[in-house]
Protein backbone atom coordinates (compact mmCIF):
# COMPACT_ATOMS: atom_id res chain seq x y z
CA UNK A 1 0.00 0.00 0.00
CA UNK A 2 1.44 3.37 -1.01
CA UNK A 3 1.80 6.19 1.48
CA UNK A 4 -1.06 8.01 -0.23
CA UNK A 5 -3.39 5.04 0.15
CA UNK A 6 -2.54 4.85 3.85
CA UNK A 7 -3.44 8.52 4.20
CA UNK A 8 -6.67 8.04 2.33
CA UNK A 9 -7.49 5.17 4.70
CA UNK A 10 -7.06 7.54 7.65
CA UNK A 11 -9.27 10.11 5.92
CA UNK A 12 -11.92 7.45 5.46
CA UNK A 13 -11.90 6.89 9.22
CA UNK A 14 -12.27 10.61 9.86
CA UNK A 15 -15.18 10.98 7.42
CA UNK A 16 -17.02 7.88 8.63
CA UNK A 17 -19.84 7.82 11.17
CA UNK A 18 -18.08 5.57 13.67
CA UNK A 19 -15.33 5.80 16.27
CA UNK A 20 -12.30 3.49 16.31
CA UNK A 21 -9.57 2.70 18.81
CA UNK A 22 -6.10 2.76 17.24
CA UNK A 23 -3.37 0.33 18.17
CA UNK A 24 -0.49 1.96 20.04
CA UNK A 25 2.65 1.25 17.99
CA UNK A 26 6.25 2.24 18.48
CA UNK A 27 8.51 -0.06 16.42
CA UNK A 28 8.54 -2.59 13.58
CA UNK A 29 7.31 -5.47 15.72
CA UNK A 30 4.44 -3.62 17.37
CA UNK A 31 3.11 -2.20 14.10
CA UNK A 32 3.14 -5.63 12.47
CA UNK A 33 1.26 -7.13 15.40
CA UNK A 34 -1.31 -4.32 15.32
CA UNK A 35 -1.72 -4.83 11.58
CA UNK A 36 -2.12 -8.60 11.93
CA UNK A 37 -4.73 -8.17 14.67
CA UNK A 38 -6.86 -6.00 12.40
CA UNK A 39 -6.47 -2.57 13.92
CA UNK A 40 -7.56 0.02 11.33
CA UNK A 41 -4.98 2.53 12.50
CA UNK A 42 -1.77 2.82 14.47
CA UNK A 43 -1.00 5.63 16.92
CA UNK A 44 2.65 6.56 17.42
CA UNK A 45 2.52 8.50 20.66
CA UNK A 46 5.17 10.86 21.96
CA UNK A 47 5.52 9.04 25.27
CA UNK A 48 5.89 5.67 23.52
CA UNK A 49 8.45 7.15 21.14
CA UNK A 50 10.48 8.67 23.96
CA UNK A 51 10.51 5.41 25.91
CA UNK A 52 11.24 3.17 22.92
CA UNK A 53 13.97 5.34 21.41
CA UNK A 54 15.55 7.04 24.42
CA UNK A 55 14.34 5.16 27.46
CA UNK A 56 13.23 8.54 28.81
CA UNK A 57 9.93 10.02 30.02
CA UNK A 58 7.88 12.24 27.73
CA UNK A 59 9.55 15.60 28.42
CA UNK A 60 10.38 16.70 24.85
CA UNK A 61 13.90 15.27 24.73
CA UNK A 62 13.41 13.34 21.50
CA UNK A 63 14.47 15.00 18.24
CA UNK A 64 12.64 15.24 14.94
CA UNK A 65 15.30 13.11 13.27
CA UNK A 66 14.86 10.32 15.82
CA UNK A 67 11.07 10.41 15.53
CA UNK A 68 11.08 10.44 11.72
CA UNK A 69 13.59 7.58 11.51
CA UNK A 70 11.46 5.44 13.79
CA UNK A 71 8.41 6.24 11.68
CA UNK A 72 10.37 5.29 8.57
CA UNK A 73 11.22 1.90 10.10
CA UNK A 74 7.56 1.26 10.85
CA UNK A 75 6.48 2.34 7.37
CA UNK A 76 8.86 -0.20 5.88
CA UNK A 77 7.68 -2.98 8.18
CA UNK A 78 3.93 -2.67 7.64
CA UNK A 79 1.26 -0.86 5.64
CA UNK A 80 -0.95 0.07 8.59
CA UNK A 81 -1.79 3.80 8.52
CA UNK A 82 -0.13 5.62 11.42
CA UNK A 83 -1.11 8.86 13.14
CA UNK A 84 1.98 10.47 14.66
CA UNK A 85 2.15 12.65 17.75
CA UNK A 86 4.49 15.36 16.47
CA UNK A 87 4.43 17.19 19.80
CA UNK A 88 5.00 20.94 19.35
CA UNK A 89 6.68 20.48 15.98
CA UNK A 90 10.15 20.71 17.52
CA UNK A 91 10.44 24.47 17.58
CA UNK A 92 8.71 27.47 16.08
CA UNK A 93 6.44 27.57 13.03
CA UNK A 94 9.34 27.12 10.64
CA UNK A 95 10.41 24.00 12.54
CA UNK A 96 6.82 22.76 12.35
CA UNK A 97 6.92 23.06 8.56
CA UNK A 98 10.08 20.98 8.46
CA UNK A 99 8.54 18.45 10.85
CA UNK A 100 5.62 17.92 8.49
CA UNK A 101 7.95 17.43 5.54
CA UNK A 102 10.07 14.86 7.36
CA UNK A 103 7.17 12.84 8.75
CA UNK A 104 5.42 12.90 5.39
CA UNK A 105 8.56 11.53 3.74
CA UNK A 106 8.75 8.87 6.48
CA UNK A 107 5.30 7.57 5.59
CA UNK A 108 3.07 9.00 8.32
CA UNK A 109 -0.62 8.95 7.41
CA UNK A 110 -1.29 11.92 9.65
CA UNK A 111 0.16 13.97 12.47
CA UNK A 112 -0.82 16.26 15.31
CA UNK A 113 0.68 19.63 16.19
CA UNK A 114 -0.08 20.80 19.71
CA UNK A 115 -0.21 24.20 21.35
CA UNK A 116 1.56 23.20 24.56
CA UNK A 117 4.67 25.25 25.33
CA UNK A 118 7.54 22.77 24.94
CA UNK A 119 10.11 22.07 26.17
CA UNK A 120 9.12 23.03 29.69
CA UNK A 121 10.33 26.50 30.61
CA UNK A 122 12.56 27.18 33.61
CA UNK A 123 10.48 27.50 36.77
CA UNK A 124 7.24 26.41 35.07
CA UNK A 125 5.81 23.84 37.47
CA UNK A 126 2.72 23.20 35.35
CA UNK A 127 2.15 22.83 31.59
CA UNK A 128 1.59 26.07 29.73
CA UNK A 129 0.13 26.93 26.35
CA UNK A 130 1.60 29.08 23.62
CA UNK A 131 -0.47 32.07 22.54
CA UNK A 132 -3.32 31.54 20.12
CA UNK A 133 -1.48 33.64 17.53
CA UNK A 134 1.58 31.40 17.76
CA UNK A 135 -0.63 28.33 17.59
CA UNK A 136 -2.25 29.64 14.42
CA UNK A 137 1.17 30.27 12.92
CA UNK A 138 2.20 26.70 13.65
CA UNK A 139 -0.97 25.26 12.15
CA UNK A 140 -0.61 27.35 9.01
CA UNK A 141 3.04 26.35 8.69
CA UNK A 142 2.09 22.69 9.05
CA UNK A 143 -0.46 22.97 6.26
CA UNK A 144 2.03 24.82 4.07
CA UNK A 145 4.65 22.13 4.63
CA UNK A 146 2.37 19.39 3.36
CA UNK A 147 3.47 18.13 -0.05
CA UNK A 148 0.86 15.39 -0.32
CA UNK A 149 -2.61 16.86 0.08
CA UNK A 150 -3.85 13.54 1.48
CA UNK A 151 -1.60 13.81 4.56
CA UNK A 152 -3.86 14.39 7.57
CA UNK A 153 -2.99 17.31 9.83
CA UNK A 154 -4.78 17.71 13.14
CA UNK A 155 -4.80 20.80 15.32
CA UNK A 156 -4.26 19.74 18.92
CA UNK A 157 -4.94 21.55 22.16
CA UNK A 158 -4.56 20.67 25.81
CA UNK A 159 -6.43 23.76 26.94
CA UNK A 160 -9.24 21.80 28.61
CA UNK A 161 -6.95 20.80 31.48
CA UNK A 162 -4.44 23.66 31.29
CA UNK A 163 -6.59 26.79 30.97
CA UNK A 164 -10.32 26.19 30.49
CA UNK A 165 -12.96 24.49 28.39
CA UNK A 166 -13.91 27.84 26.88
CA UNK A 167 -10.32 28.44 25.82
CA UNK A 168 -10.14 24.97 24.28
CA UNK A 169 -13.26 25.65 22.25
CA UNK A 170 -12.01 29.07 21.16
CA UNK A 171 -8.68 27.66 20.03
CA UNK A 172 -10.31 24.75 18.23
CA UNK A 173 -12.66 27.01 16.31
CA UNK A 174 -9.77 29.14 15.12
CA UNK A 175 -7.75 26.08 14.11
CA UNK A 176 -10.77 24.94 12.11
CA UNK A 177 -10.72 28.15 10.10
CA UNK A 178 -7.04 27.56 9.29
CA UNK A 179 -7.92 24.42 7.33
CA UNK A 180 -6.88 21.51 9.55
CA UNK A 181 -8.45 18.13 8.86
CA UNK A 182 -9.56 17.47 12.41
CA UNK A 183 -9.21 18.44 16.06
CA UNK A 184 -7.27 16.53 18.72
CA UNK A 185 -8.17 17.14 22.37
CA UNK A 186 -6.43 16.02 25.54
CA UNK A 187 -7.65 16.50 29.09
CA UNK A 188 -11.35 15.84 28.50
CA UNK A 189 -12.74 14.07 31.56
CA UNK A 190 -16.54 14.43 31.36
CA UNK A 191 -19.31 13.94 28.84
CA UNK A 192 -20.43 17.52 29.43
CA UNK A 193 -17.06 18.78 28.23
CA UNK A 194 -17.16 16.65 25.11
CA UNK A 195 -20.78 17.59 24.43
CA UNK A 196 -19.86 21.28 24.57
CA UNK A 197 -16.89 20.83 22.26
CA UNK A 198 -18.90 18.81 19.74
CA UNK A 199 -21.66 21.42 19.72
CA UNK A 200 -19.24 24.30 19.15
CA UNK A 201 -17.05 22.76 16.43
CA UNK A 202 -17.55 21.06 13.08
CA UNK A 203 -14.54 18.91 12.24
CA UNK A 204 -13.85 15.26 13.18
CA UNK A 205 -12.57 14.88 16.74
CA UNK A 206 -9.72 12.74 18.03
CA UNK A 207 -9.79 12.06 21.76
CA UNK A 208 -6.42 11.69 23.44
CA UNK A 209 -7.54 9.52 26.31
CA UNK A 210 -10.57 9.73 28.59
CA UNK A 211 -12.01 8.06 31.71
CA UNK A 212 -13.51 4.59 31.45
CA UNK A 213 -17.04 5.99 31.59
CA UNK A 214 -16.35 7.76 28.29
CA UNK A 215 -15.18 4.66 26.42
CA UNK A 216 -18.51 3.84 24.79
CA UNK A 217 -17.77 4.01 21.06
CA UNK A 218 -21.41 4.59 20.16
CA UNK A 219 -21.62 7.67 22.35
CA UNK A 220 -18.26 8.95 21.13
CA UNK A 221 -19.30 8.50 17.51
CA UNK A 222 -22.47 10.49 18.17
CA UNK A 223 -20.27 13.37 19.31
CA UNK A 224 -18.18 13.23 16.11
CA UNK A 225 -15.25 11.50 17.80
CA UNK A 226 -13.71 9.33 15.11
CA UNK A 227 -10.57 8.15 16.91
CA UNK A 228 -10.30 7.50 20.65
CA UNK A 229 -6.90 6.66 22.11
CA UNK A 230 -6.58 4.01 24.82
CA UNK A 231 -3.17 5.00 26.13
CA UNK A 232 0.03 3.14 25.36
CA UNK A 233 -0.31 -0.14 27.23
CA UNK A 234 1.61 -2.26 24.67
CA UNK A 235 4.99 -0.68 25.37
CA UNK A 236 4.29 -0.82 29.11
CA UNK A 237 3.47 -4.52 28.80
CA UNK A 238 6.60 -5.10 26.72
CA UNK A 239 8.71 -3.36 29.37
CA UNK A 240 7.32 -5.64 32.07
CA UNK A 241 7.84 -8.73 29.90
CA UNK A 242 11.50 -7.89 29.26
CA UNK A 243 12.03 -7.17 32.96
CA UNK A 244 10.42 -10.44 34.04
CA UNK A 245 12.39 -12.47 31.48
CA UNK A 246 15.76 -10.97 32.35
CA UNK A 247 15.07 -11.26 36.07
CA UNK A 248 14.17 -14.93 35.68
CA UNK A 249 17.36 -15.61 33.72
CA UNK A 250 19.43 -13.73 36.29
CA UNK A 251 17.84 -15.80 39.04
CA UNK A 252 18.85 -19.02 37.35
CA UNK A 253 15.73 -20.01 35.47
CA UNK A 254 16.55 -22.08 32.40
CA UNK A 255 15.63 -20.50 29.05
CA UNK A 256 13.42 -23.53 28.37
CA UNK A 257 11.51 -22.89 31.60
CA UNK A 258 10.70 -19.26 30.84
CA UNK A 259 7.04 -18.32 30.73
CA UNK A 260 5.31 -15.97 28.33
CA UNK A 261 7.55 -16.51 25.31
CA UNK A 262 5.92 -16.28 21.87
CA UNK A 263 5.24 -19.41 19.88
CA UNK A 264 7.46 -20.22 16.92
CA UNK A 265 4.45 -19.56 14.69
CA UNK A 266 3.92 -16.07 16.08
CA UNK A 267 7.62 -15.20 15.82
CA UNK A 268 7.69 -16.45 12.23
CA UNK A 269 4.60 -14.42 11.35
CA UNK A 270 5.89 -11.22 12.92
CA UNK A 271 9.19 -11.62 11.05
CA UNK A 272 7.25 -12.23 7.80
CA UNK A 273 9.44 -15.32 7.47
CA UNK A 274 7.38 -16.89 4.68
CA UNK A 275 7.83 -13.78 2.52
CA UNK A 276 11.56 -13.69 3.23
CA UNK A 277 11.99 -17.37 2.34
CA UNK A 278 10.16 -16.84 -0.94
CA UNK A 279 12.47 -13.96 -1.82
CA UNK A 280 15.50 -16.07 -0.92
CA UNK A 281 14.28 -18.69 -3.37
CA UNK A 282 13.37 -16.21 -6.09
CA UNK A 283 16.39 -13.94 -5.86
CA UNK A 284 19.20 -16.08 -4.43
CA UNK A 285 18.16 -19.55 -5.52
CA UNK A 286 18.12 -20.76 -1.91
CA UNK A 287 15.78 -23.37 -0.49
CA UNK A 288 13.38 -25.70 -2.21
UniProtKB/Swiss-Prot annotation:
| UniProt remark on cofactor binding | Binds 1 Mg(2+) ion per subunit.
The chemistry this enzyme catalyses reads:
oxaloacetate + H(+) = pyruvate + CO2
The UniProt annotation places substrate binding at 47, 156, 232
Highest taxon, organism lineage? Bacteria
> Any idea which UniProt keywords this protein has?
Decarboxylase, Lyase, Magnesium, Metal-binding
Cofactor(s) the record lists: Mg(2+)
Return the InterPro entries for the record.
ICL/PEPM, Oxaloacetate_deCOase_bac, Pyrv/PenolPyrv_kinase-like_dom, Pyrv_kinase-like_dom_sf
> Which residues are noted in the entry as Mg(2+)-binding?
85
The record's EC number reads 4.1.1.112
A Gene Ontology biological process term: oxaloacetate metabolic process
Top EC class of this enzyme: lyase
A Pfam family name for this chain? PEP_mutase
Q: Name one GO molecular function term.
A: oxaloacetate decarboxylase activity
The UniProt function text for this chain reads: Catalyzes the decarboxylation of oxaloacetate into pyruvate. Seems to play a role in maintaining cellular concentrations of bicarbonate and pyruvate.
- Subunit composition and interactions: Homotetramer; dimer of dimers.
PANTHER family documented for this protein: OXALOACETATE DECARBOXYLASE, PHOSPHOENOLPYRUVATE CARBOXYLASE
The family this protein is said to belong to:
Belongs to the isocitrate lyase/PEP mutase superfamily. Oxaloacetate decarboxylase family.
The protein's name in its UniProt record: Oxaloacetate decarboxylase
Task: Give the organism the record lists.
Answer: Bradyrhizobium sp. (strain ORS 278)
Amino acid sequence: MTFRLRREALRTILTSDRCVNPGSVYDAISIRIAEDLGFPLGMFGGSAASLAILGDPDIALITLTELAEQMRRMSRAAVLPVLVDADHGYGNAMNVRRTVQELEAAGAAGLTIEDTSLPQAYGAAKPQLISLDEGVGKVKAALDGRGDSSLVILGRTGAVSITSLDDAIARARVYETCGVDGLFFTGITTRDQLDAIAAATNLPIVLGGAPEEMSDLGYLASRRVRIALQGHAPIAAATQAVYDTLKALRDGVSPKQLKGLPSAELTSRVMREADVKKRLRDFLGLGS
